[in-house]
Amino acid sequence: MADDAAPHADVLNSTAQGQLKSIIDRVERLEVEKTEIAEQIKEVYLEAKGNGFDVKILRKVVRLRKTDRAKRQEEDAILDLYLSAIGEI
């Protein structure tokens, strides 16, 4: 694979090659950070579970807090409408 890439190296000038390498390096560092953060979040949820909290509900609360209040109210109203239409509420 490296042999295939070598003939194309001259397609990009040295500045572009440097920029490309920098971008790739940054993305790779961010991917590592993302993995580390995901592990930390997992640990927080495990701590919450250990303290008796329902992790599924906590995740839902976090997700809901990310949503705009008006958008959430609109979704709730539509959900209630649908549930009412099928006799669930």
UniProtKB/Swiss-Prot annotation:
Pfam families recorded: GapR_DNA-bd
GO MF terms held by the record: DNA binding
NCBIfam families on file: PRK13694.1 (NF010247)
Recorded family membership: Belongs to the UPF0335 family.
The protein, known as: UPF0335 protein Caul_0876
Organism: Caulobacter sp. (strain K31)
